[in-house]
Structures are given as C-alpha cells and as structure tokens.
Amino acid sequence: MSPSRPAADERFDSARVAAEIATLAEKHTGNDAAFRTALAMLMKAELAKARTEAEAQLLRDRHGRRCAERLCYVQDAIIRLLFNAATEYLYNTPTPSSSERMTVVATGGYGRGLMAPESDIDLLFILPYKQTAWGEQVAEVILYCLWDIGLKVGHATRSVDECIRQARADMTIRTAILETRFLAGDEALYAELVERFDKEVVEGTAAEFVAAKLAEREERHRRSGQSRYLVEPNVKDGKGGLRDLHTLFWIAKYVYRVREASELSERGVFDPAEFRTFRRCEDFLWSVRCNIHFVTKRAEDRLSFDLQREIGVRLGYTSHPGMQDVERFMKHYFLIAKEVGNLTAILCAKLEDQQAKAAPALTRMMARLRPAAKRRRVPESDDFVIDNNRINLAVPDVFKHDPVNLIRIFRLAQKNNLAFHPDAMRSVTRSLSLITPQLRDNPEANRLFVEILTSDNAEPVLRRMNETGVLGRFIRAFGRIVSMMQFNMYHSYTVDEHLIRCVGNLQEIERGGNDEFALSSELIRKIRPDHRAVLYAAVLLHDIAKGQPEDHSTAGAKVARRLCPRFGFSTADTELVAWLIEKHLVMSTVAQSRDLSDRKTIENFAAVVETVEQMKMLTILTTADIRGVGPGVWNGWKAQLIRTLYYETEPVLTGGFSEVNRAERIRAAQAEFRAAFTEWPEADLNAYVARHYPAYWLKVDLQRKIRHARFLRASEQAGHKLAINVGFDEARAVTELTILAVDHPWLLSVIAGACASAGANIVDAQIYTTTDGRALDTISISREYDRDEDEGRRATRIGETIEEVLEGKLRLPEAVARRASSGSKAKLRAFVVEPEVEINNNWSDRYTVIEVSGLDRPGLLYQLTTAISKLNLNIASAHVATFGERARDVFYVTDLLGAQITAPTRQAAIKRALVHLLANGDAAEKPAA
C-alpha cells in the first residue's frame, strides 16, 4: 500500500500539464462541458506521447519493470490532475462538510504500481459515509474523462465500513484492498482503511487467505494450461507467469506483513540470491508483456506463435547454429518460468513447514493445523531425516560430504513418498556446483539414477530433478534441451517436458488398464526383462539432441553411446538404446504415411526393425512418444495404424509365424463388429461385411466401423447416393466429415476443393473404397468453434458445399480462388517450412510413392490433387496428415496406363511442379506426357 514512485528517468511534467489545465479552465469558464472535452483531449495527447516514449525507452534498455513503473507513474499523474481539475474548477467546495471528502485509490494490478501499456485501470473511490452528490460528481468527471481517453476502467465507490465488510466476505475484494495505493484526495481516510483492514480483516486469517490464493492459482493454471512448458504461454496467467509472482507477493504481504517486494529478503521469505531471481524473473516477464501490448495494441497476454519471433527480435535475440532466434528467446522464457516455479515451491513449502502441515496440501486446502511431527531418520540413510513428513538434511553439509547425496535424496524421496523440505530444496540448488565429472561417472550415483528412472512415480521425481537443476547438470546433454522450445505448432511442450511426460506415458503403458495403449501394454510384458531399463533410457533420451545442426535422431544415438555405459549398460544394451533413438520416428512415419496393405511397405519396415524384440520396443517407444507430443495427438486412429503395422510385419520377421495371423485378425475384427449389430438380420450383416476389403477391417477402429455401418445403412435406406455425416473429436479439436459417394478418380480432389472453398482446413483424411464401387472417405477438418452447436452448423454448410460440387452446382476453381484471396491464418504465416518432394519406387512394387511436405494452408490438398491429376497421374491412394503447421501428404500414383513413373526426366518434372506449388500456391509445370 505504498505510494507510487516515479522511475528515476521519468520525464512526465505534471506542473506543465497542470498549467495547461488552468489555461483551459479559464478559457472555458462557464462552459463545463467544453472544459471537460478539452481536458480529455489534452490528457489523451499526453498519454499517447508518454506511451511512445515508454516504448522507445523499452526498446533501448529492455527493462520491463522500469517500463511498467513509468507507465504507471504517468497514469497516476493523469488521475491526480483529473482529481484536482474536478475539485478546483468544476466542483470546488471552499468549506467542505465532513461527508464531502474522498480518496482515490489504485487497486488490483494498478495498485502494485506496475502497468502494461493496454492494461485495465482499477480505481476505488473511498468515502467517509454514504455517497454524496459532490462525491458522485467528482468520480464522474474522472471516470468519463478516462473513458474518453480510451482507457478501460474498473471502479467501485465504497465507504470504509463497506470496504471492511466486503473484504471479510469476498476474497477477491480482500486481495484488491491488500494492493491498494493512495492516488489523490483525503490521505487520512486512506490511512483509516489501511489500519482497519490490518486489524479487522487480516489478523488471524493468514491460513484462510493462503489456501484461497493457492486454490485460485491451481484453477488459473487449469484454465490456461497446467504445464509451464506449453509452447504458447500466457505471460500473465500461465504457470510460471507474472500472476504466480503476484500470488507470491500477495501471500508474503498477508502472512509476513511486508509492504515492498524488497522486504521479502529482509523478512527471510527469500534469501538474497532468491530475491535477485525474483526481480530478474519479474523484469523479464514485464519486458515480454509490455512488448506484446505495444506490438498488438491490445491487452493481449498470450505469447502466440505469430508474436514470438517479433518479440524475440525486439528483445535482442539472434539465431545460432541449430537454434532460431525465436527458439533461443522461448528457451529463455521457459527457463524464467521454471525459476518462478522454484520460487513458488520454496514459499509454499516454507509456509507449510511453518504451519507444521502433515502433507504438502496447501494447494488443496489449508485445514486445521497440528503440532510438528518429530524428526526421524530416513530409512537407508543417516544423512537425511523426515521433518514434518518432508525429506530434509540431517546436517547442513551432507552434499559436500558426499555429492552422491544430490542423487540419493531424490531416490529416497521417491521410495518413501516424501515431499521436499524447503531447506533441502534450497540446499540442493546451492550445491549444483558439486555435480562434477567425478560425480557423473560415479557408479553409485548412476545406479541410483537408473533406479529413479525405472521405479514408480518417475515422472514427478524427474520433473523435480529438472526444476532444481540437478537433471541437467547430471546429464549435461539433457541440460542443453532444458526449456528448449521447438518453433512449430505440433509440439505442445518444451523438449525436456516432452521427454519427462513420455517417461510417465511409459509407466502408464506398463501399468496397463488403458485401452489407448492396449497393444503396447501387451507387448511390454513380453519384452526381455533385461530390456526394461533399455526401454526407459531410450524414452528419456530419444529427443535429447534436439537443437543441434545434425539430425536429432542420429545425434541422439551418439549421445546414448556415450551416456549409457555410465548407467551400467552393456555394449549390446547401449547399442540397442542407440538404435531405438535413431529409429524412433520410423514406425510413426510408416504407419501414418504408407499403404499398409502394400506388401513392399511391410517388407521395407521389417528390414528396418530386424527382429520382433526390437519391433516390440519400437512400438512401445512410438506410442509413448506420440502421446507425449500434446493433448489429442495420440488417438484411436493412430493406435489402429500402429497395431496394423505391427501385426502385418510380425510374420515377415518370424518366417510366417505370428501370434495373431492376418486372416485371424480379420476374422476377429469382423466378429467384434458383428457383436455390435445383433439386431441386424444375418443376411444384412453378411452382405455388409463383404462390402469391405481386408485392409478396412485391419486399419479402422471399432467405433468408427460402427459409425460407418449405421451411416451407410441409413443413407441407403433413405435412397441417398451421396450422403455426409458429421462427427466431433474433441480430443483432437477436429470435426469429422464422413462422405459416401460413387467412387471416381477425382473424388478426393473434389472433396478437398469443396472444403477449401468453404474455409475448412483438412488435417487428416482416411480414404476407403467398398467392393461395390462406393467411396467412404472420412475427412478431419480443424475445429473453428468451441460449441458443438456452432461447429455443427459450420460442418453442415461445408457438407452442403461438397454436395453442390459433386452434383455440379458449384464450380470449384472459382470458389477456391475466392476463399484463397481472403488469405491464410496469421499463425501459419509465422512459420517457414521448406517445401520437399520425394518420389520413390522402392516403397511399392505397383505404385510410385510421392511424398510432399510443406507449410499447411487452406486448400493445399485440393491444389496438390489437382496438380497431380493435371500431370497425367492417377491417384490410387492418399495418406494425408498435418503435424502442426507442416502438411505431409503421401500419394500412391501410376501413369495413365497403370505403370510406375520410372523415367528420371518425368520424375524431375513432377518434382519441380509440386515444389513450385508448395512454395507459391500454383503449379508451374504443364502436364507431363
């Protein structure tokens, strides 16, 4: 509740502006409306000039906190000038009564003395008693002028009694009053509020307040994304953002009665180094937030992809080999978020310890306090004790005495299900210099680490090791990818968080019981017992070489060959880890972009995986990896593709033997389907089953088969030759359009063009043909609306467009051109994806495989299929997928005579045309002969 202090280099001249106001008042004597209009115009000009100067200064010195202080100081000055203008020139009362007093107070974020350029202003008008005509008029002048300036103002008018009463009942109001700051008016009235608030509201309610604030924090994180490593973070409300720092300060103000952030160190809340970290984090986050507001010219707090590069450049980041400027900036951002998390953990643990909590449950509720439990020794070690159900050091120098304890403490906490005592956490972070080459090579330290990795609850323990800095010091290659962001729309987390989540996925696979992982859960029980640790190591390390100029799979295998002998792995096991890392993308690529019914696909994949044991391990790694990319990325469709690839390949590797051969799997899939339709007549079931080729029964999951059957039956009973069904996949944030039509070579192109003309972006396509010549295509399009009702109406419009095109009522080229002229999304424009086209005859004996990769855009699939047809090629099958901003589409084609494309000159012409299309949006080549 301290008064605002101007930044040292502040140049706002209040005296000059006050003189101009006096001149305006004299000029407009007797015309209050004209004076108020002129007053607002003057203030608007002054504020605009001050903001321009603040932005220029921020670009020069990059001090975010100083910029926020400067903007706040200017706003303070404007409000004081408005208050003075209202009370001196408009509603002057030479002898005010006791009720004609008012205090103008800043609250909320503004009350902290820090403002982002487009932030709202929260004001509290405090009165001694009830509202008076004079008070209402003065408040009205201030508010209307601020609104005329273009500011968003939240406001309330209350007496001191009302403030106290409402603060007791409402935690939001209590927090707002906690952060009030005097601006103008009667200081005695403000002093009364402060004194009564401390005595009548704060005293004896610390536990209640802390519990409420931490519960709010958890809910805020849930809304904005639980992980602090989400790649489009919310700088204000996200985990590790400014609001977390604010929560720390609120709690400290309430519990320790500090007034200024500098007192956090004086009161022992943080040690001097931790307070310097607090200030450094705060300054960086304010720099980012202020720059976002200046760039967008709105109160935007999400650091979205289309902003990240520009903000990074404004903050002075440059590209280095293997890392773009934007990736270096975001790595720094996530390192800061990690440090904010550490500060939060330290304060929360300190509070809980002081309150002698039985478990770290402040984030859930601060229940009744009880006396501290007696310290007792941790089993298996004399160096650590259990202190209030937290692991702590028996003596201060346990790490210096034996550096292996820096690893051992995490293993003991894991085995005994203990949280960390704040003193232990601090000691760990202060002892990182003890993690030397000698400790990294220590057999006991490495044995303990492998135990951590392969034991229950490895994910949270590894995350704690990462957040304290131990993991990155102990495995230096891991340290290089800590907080590393990949600048793309596919990965939802930083590299280190992705790897740790993948370990958690592996443990969930091993526990079993989740149908998402049915195949992998079955396989993990069948791998050799001595390969279990190999699998865990491969999962933890598979992306460890991200950010290097060399391909990360190849470079990661080299890291594994250096690292795994440290872990006690044999030469053979080390090579197996390296192989898994080197091949970790192969199974996903083949499953999603190759024709799994083509014998050559299976033979080629079998040649890569070599043995059933290696294929089992690669299947499990692939499953854990895909699920760790982000919410909804792993789904039933991909699970079915992986399952099909596995079981199609198994007989090739075993010389014809398979635990479940192909014919049996087809029969089992059909039996499973039949069991879902007991109400159908047997003849109808037999006829329907016969309509689908074997690949359909192997590649499509049961729920989709059921939907297809009901859709086909209803459409045909209604006499529809063309029908469209709409479904929603919330996990993937897509809408599915299933289209039933008479099959013909241009059908996919027509559907893609219809979607493009309707503004729908295709992210996936599953294409099947029935034995009676009907096409059954499921197209997944990006979801545009949150509510299913709105999305359903949009999908219906898209379906109508598809029908109009297929019925010849709408010409596609013109419709697509009209939609394309509206431009693509800004988020996609933030990315650069080099176009790539590969033409290969080795993946099929019958078809030429064309694989294209480039920046996704509305209408791309239509453009590609149209161009391929114009190149006199027939598309036999297509495998369509998007990975964030990158489209990767694979087409199995022949020439018009049904032969592969073997002539090098023709292959080169096809490649030139498609590369040009990917880069420029049109095909430059004429049809090839």
Curated annotation (Swiss-Prot):
Ways its activity is controlled: Uridylyltransferase (UTase) activity is inhibited by glutamine, while glutamine activates uridylyl-removing (UR) activity.
Superkingdom field: Bacteria
Stored SMART domains: HDc
Annotated EC: 2.7.7.59, 3.1.4.-
Signal peptide: none
Disulfide bonds: none
Residue stretches making up the HD domain: 495-618
Annotated stretches, region: Uridylyltransferase: 1-379
The protein's required cofactors: Mg(2+)
Coiled-coil region(s): none
Keywords, comma-separated and alphabetical: Hydrolase, Magnesium, Multifunctional enzyme, Nitrogen fixation, Nucleotidyltransferase, Repeat, Transferase
Any GO BP annotation: regulation of nitrogen utilization
Region (Uridylyl-removing), start-end ranges: 380-735
Domain (ACT) ranges: 736-818, 849-929
GO molecular function: [protein-PII] uridylyltransferase activity; phosphoric diester hydrolase activity
Function: Modifies, by uridylylation and deuridylylation, the PII regulatory proteins (GlnB and homologs), in response to the nitrogen status of the cell that GlnD senses through the glutamine level. Under low glutamine levels, catalyzes the conversion of the PII proteins and UTP to PII-UMP and PPi, while under higher glutamine levels, GlnD hydrolyzes PII-UMP to PII and UMP (deuridylylation). Thus, controls uridylylation state and activity of the PII proteins, and plays an important role in the regulation of nitrogen fixation and metabolism.
Domain note: Has four distinct domains: an N-terminal nucleotidyltransferase (NT) domain responsible for UTase activity, a central HD domain that encodes UR activity, and two C-terminal ACT domains that seem to have a role in glutamine sensing.
Similarity section: Belongs to the GlnD family.
Protein name: Bifunctional uridylyltransferase/uridylyl-removing enzyme
Lineage: Bacteria, Pseudomonadati, Pseudomonadota, Alphaproteobacteria, Hyphomicrobiales
